[in-house]
Structures are given as structure tokens and as C-alpha cells.
Amino acid sequence: MILYHCSPTPGLRTLEPRVTPYFGKPCQLCLTELRPMALFYGIRHFEYTYGYTRAGELYYMEQFPGMLAELYGGKSASLYLCDEREDMAFTAIPHERVTANPVPVREEIPVPDLLAALREQERLGAVRLIPWEQVDEANRRWIVDAERREILERDLLSHPEDPMARYLRAKYPESWALARQERESP
């Protein structure tokens, strides 16, 4: 089976395991069976807001207006195709495999614009992209609360110049204010 890995770094011949700075995972290399899921990782960022419906369908839900275009629009990447191996383990994330070992690249596909590539995958029915305008009130409230918890759990109020803190403060001001209020209340 072919597995995908996407990176903003072109020209790789071997994919190396690494530690991601914000997710608390061990040194590993992540791959997936799904092209659109891999495309989400063509950027290095703090959040990848995709998920799966109960029917197992992949979706991406914007968490603020214009999120998809801001994060992916005009950004290039390389989609790497690799062969599945016995040392690749499934994770709790559907369609994801991880390994602690380097993996040779079978093929590299340049992706000149990740947003255009994701929209093409949506057109093909491989992913549903949900714009902010279609996010219902219950999900909007969940987003505010989830980001509030993230701010508190990572103690970002104490480190306001941390890149993640600056991003969350700018994109989720209501969550930032609620976290500050919660921390300051007796």
C-alpha cells in the first residue's frame, strides 16, 4: 500500500522521524493512507483542525473566518509517496501510521498551492471543507472552550511572546480573555 507524507521541505529522498514541538508525541514519522489528510500537514503550524464524521468521512472545519485560506493559500509543499512497511504502527488517528525509523521516498509530487490542492480533493469527494460561515453555534462555543483550555494547559498566559501564545491571542481573543479571567479569579 502507498502511504503519504507532506512537508514544506522539497527534495527529500528519505523521510526522517522528528519530534513535533507542540503535540507531546515521541520522535516519529507520521504517514497516512489519505492524500487530503497528508496535505493538511504541508505546513508547520500549531493546529490541524481536521476530523472524521461518525461515518468515517474526513473533514476540515475552520475555527475562525478565513482560516483555510490564511494557513494554506499560496503555500507550496511536497507530497511524498512511500511504501507501507511492517514497522509502521496504526495510531488512534484513523488512517495514520507511525514509525521511529527513516523511510525512503518512492515519489515526490510538488504541490504549488496547498489550498488549491485541498479544494481539488474536496471536488473529488475525498474531504469536506467547512467554512466558518457554516460552523454552527454549538461548534463555535466548543472552539472557544477548547482554545481556552489549551491556553491554560500550556500556561501561555505566562509566556505571551511564545509564538503559539501570540497566535492564539490574535485568533481566539474570546478564549484568551476567558482564560485570563479564569486564572485571575480566586
Segment roles from a protein language model:
Residues 1-29, 41-44:
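ADP-ribose/NAD+-binding catalytic cleft of ART/PARP-like enzymes
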Residues 41-186:
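Conserved NAD+-utilizing ADP-ribose enzyme module
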Residues 5-12, 33, 81-86:
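Short, flexible beta-strand-to-coil junctions
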